[in-house]
Amino acid sequence: MNNDVSQAILKAVIKDFKTEYSKSKEVAKLLKRIETGKATHEDSYRFALKVSDFLNKAINRNMTGDTLPNGKLYYHIAEEVLAPVLKNNHTLVTNYARDVQTILNAKDDIPFKGRVPKINADRVEGICSEYSRADVFETTRDGLNASVENYTLSSVDDTILENVKFLNNLGYHEVVERHAEPGACKWCRSLDGTYDYSSSMDTTIFKRHKRCRCVVYCSRKKDEYQDVWSKRIYQGTFKNGKII
């Protein structure tokens, strides 16, 4: 019985998501920017926000106290409904961000295509577990919406980190910028800045809390970088991937 409920909700969520996605003019514009080679990771975050918004709308319409048995999101239902649609968001967003990275690499004469990160299955399981603990699903709706958005935006963060690691290992000098959103919390403001990437750096700058809209960019800058531990600004010139 509950399996039938899961499949009915999943099919309805997927149908509504596909409808929203296919008719979106904003998505069409963002995909066009990939085709024309104009896309940046700012577009990756815009794309992620649209995708998360579509999924949240589909979930809100089809996963309710009326469609769930006893008004509760049991774990196996969460696993059968939320896990596949979250994984779909990850695929859509990381593929978009990968294509953006390919464009950026080409502009910097880097002969490597962008890469996609592995899905973080533990985070998906964590979301399923968190929202299946509530006795009344409707009381958790806002939190679930925030988690869907956070997870989808983090797919961009993870893609950028994956590519920064890859290029750094090849000897390219990667610089990471984190921009705090207007009105950001104290924690996010403390992370705002430009950082010289290294394999041993603190990767907290790639993390985000619920409802965080901060963005992360990667580039190959000259003349300035910020040490991730001391946050002091150094002036200099890059030569062979090192500051002189």
Where are these regions (language model features)?
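Domain-core detector
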Residues: 1-209, 217-244
